[in-house]
Amino acid sequence: RSNKNCEFKTIRKIIYNQKNIAIEIQSQNIETNKIDYKETLNPKLPKGISNNKNIIALIDTGVNYTLPQLHKNIAFQNKKLLGYDFWDNDNFPFDQDPRNNPFYPRHHGTTVFSVLSREAPKSTIAIYRFPALNMCKFKELIEHIAKNSIRIVNLSMGSSNINDWLCFQEAALKNNKIIFVVSAGNNGFDIDKNPIYPASLKLDNIITVTSSDLNGRVGRGSNIGNISIDFMLPAERVEVIDHRGVKAFTGGTSYAAPRLTAMISRLITANPGISNEDILKILKKRSIKSNKKVTKYGWIPDPLDNYLFN
């Protein structure tokens, strides 16, 4: 990284192991030649005990599972972390997306996890790193979720290329008892006219959500669509824990989705045998219909309230 005079200020390098797998990013001070900062990639997994709590599956860029404040909500099975890294094909679904810049990887999943853990505290979360390099692995990913009897999935991502999501669509249709809560996207347009996938897929077990402010107005840049988008929730200023373990505020449809996922998870915890159809009925009763053609069912202003759950 250089300054405006093209003078180097920082050097970053990626360290690989003998199997040619990236294990660490090091930041070197150009003046002292000392390593100022190290970012571990795929660190050791935490130890945990198996639990039978209501499980949410989080499909994202991974999670920083080393953060102590997240451990109580990480799902374990046979004392091993429940989930998988379908990007790297290993058991370390650590939060990183190196596609734009491998020296400064993007992080996203940890913040989403933190919303789920705070708003569905009695649930545990299985961590899945999505298969960015081969999107047809979504078939295998969803089968893994189904095999572990997980009923609800949070998916805060999408793209405009339907070909990326054909295998996902096939697997989601086959496993139609699983509810997929999907973010509508932050492109600032109507996804009925400009589809974003998987949000725009016509599947009964996909619930698409967009973001609002506290007064029910569409969030800045949040997509709309009274056919493709089911609900709108306040998510323009959401407290999160980022991949460093630091509290911060963020917003957008990526965080409206986990708010609705957490709400559904609490509903399932209170009513373990509830059907997908009855879940949708309760969500519709909780929503306020707007005259504006923004969503199909309306705005849920109070996703932390358990009204109608018992």
Language model region names:
Residues 1-55, 68-69, 298, 303-310:
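Protease zymogen maturation seam
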Residues 39-123, 140-152, 215, 290-291:
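Active-site core segment of subtilase-fold serine proteases
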Residues 57-59, 84, 126-128, 181, ...:
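Hydrophobic/aromatic beta-strand patches that form the interior of the parallel beta-sheet core
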Residues 60, 196-269, 273:
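Extracellular S/T/G-rich loop segment that most often corresponds to the catalytic His/Ser-adjacent loop
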Residues 68, 72-79, 169-172, 197-200, ...:
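Glycine-rich, phosphate-binding/catalytic loops in enzymes
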